[in-house]
């Protein structure tokens, strides 16, 4: 949501994209980009080795395609602190230009997805639905209602309950939920899943997910 002041203004949204393994960075990579757009819906194939198009859409403004536009030397402070290479180049496929009238207020959503029907996605509805789901996650546990903690500790507890949700994902190959060992880089490891099983799934009363996680691990047993 944006509210303009008393003069005409222009908001420019410039998405940056990349295609690489998460253990590496692109510094001197030449992207072989193919893109097409219809209105504000953009389809991008970022590299000849990529078989999956990326789709982008903005609820407002107008899209302007760029050619050979690179955002250079993005700096990663944490990578520097860890002793890794800390600068990377990204590709800028184009920009969304949004005009704002004096004192105008707008709700603008930008959606990037692998789903082709991206123009049908209402960003505001997605956000509101997720906020409602997150509230359900917190209160369905029953932990908050029975807590006698002060507000500061209660906020920390809510954040912790929400954090557990990041580790529970759907595994399409089995059609079951599983626990990943470290979001988003690691896959599901049986040992880590079972170590965290009680805290992630039982204390939070995710019993159906707990059942699916056990079934997933059973299927992964050697010769099982």
Residue ranges and their predicted role:
Residues 1-224:
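Acidic, mature catalytic/reactive cores of soluble proteins
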